[in-house]
């Protein structure tokens, strides 16, 4: 579970991260990363209706939240992250989703630096 201080809540934060951050995309997810100094890392999720019904979207969000908690533990400060789930994420097995997520984050962070 992500602590409140690590959750992205306002649309302004989402917009800033997506527009000015670096992007890394894979089959199941697209990740936008913006590096910032001194602030706690924050994570936000975008799971549209194209992914599936409400039950499916919530399942995808729970899975992505668990992966993001791992990222925040590794880097508790200095990174804003927006994770956008693509429709194939609804049926992706856990290991494939985890591999795509980690790879997309690594690509986006590398492009930021």
From Swiss-Prot:
Instruction: Tell me how this protein assembles.
Output: Consists of a catalytic RNA component (M1 or rnpB) and a protein subunit.
Protein name according to UniProt: Ribonuclease P protein component
Q: In Gene Ontology terms, what is a biological process of this protein? A: tRNA 5'-leader removal
Q: Name one Pfam family in it.
A: Ribonuclease_P
Q: What is the lineage of its organism?
A: Bacteria, Bacillati, Actinomycetota, Actinomycetes, Micrococcales
Name of the coding gene: rnpA
Keyword annotations for this protein, in alphabetical order, are: Endonuclease, Hydrolase, Nuclease, RNA-binding, tRNA processing
- So what does this thing catalyse? Endonucleolytic cleavage of RNA, removing 5'-extranucleotides from tRNA precursor
Classification via PANTHER family: RIBONUCLEASE P PROTEIN COMPONENT
Q: Which family does it belong to?
A: Belongs to the RnpA family.
| Source organism superkingdom | Bacteria
Alphabetically, the GO molecular function entries are:
3'-tRNA processing endoribonuclease activity; ribonuclease P activity; tRNA binding
Asked if Ribosomal protein is a keyword of the record, the answer is no
User: Region (Disordered) spans which residues?
Assistant: 1-23
Query: InterPro entries recorded for this chain?
Result: Ribosomal_Su5_D2-typ_SF, Ribsml_uS5_D2-typ_fold_subgr, RNase_P, RNase_P_CS
Which cysteines are disulphide-bonded? none
EC number(s) recorded for this UniProt protein? 3.1.26.5
Q: Biased-composition ranges for Basic residues?
A: 1-10
PROSITE patterns according to UniProt: RIBONUCLEASE_P
Of the GO CC terms on this record, one is: ribonuclease P complex
**Source species of the chain:** Kocuria rhizophila (strain ATCC 9341 / DSM 348 / NBRC 103217 / DC2201)
